[in-house]
A protein has these predicted regions:
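C-terminal flanking helix
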Residues: 49-50
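Extreme N-terminal segment that seeds HTH/winged-HTH DNA-binding domains in transcriptional regulators
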Residues: 1-32
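Key DNA-contact positions within bacterial/archaeal DNA-binding proteins
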Residues: 39
Length: 62
């Protein structure tokens, strides 16, 4: 069984996934990829923004 990512690792993976995707990714899709709920992804996005990442939210995802 794959070990769960800690918060820092998970946020790094979210940034990587967003940079690699040509299309917006939903919070649910990011949650599925990182093994957490959509709400945790929303919180992680907020933390990444406070760290200086420019992450736009659209109706189709981030």
């Amino acid at each position: 069984m794959e070990q769960a990512l800690n918060g820092s690792q998970r946020r790094k993976k979210i940034v990587m996934l967003l940079k690699q995707s040509p299309n917006p990714l939903s919070g649910a899709a990011l949650g599925k990829e990182t093994g957490v709920s959509r709400q945790v992804v929303v919180q992680d996005i907020a933390l990444l923004r406070t760290e200086g990442y420019e992450i736009s939210a659209t109706p189709r995802g981030y």
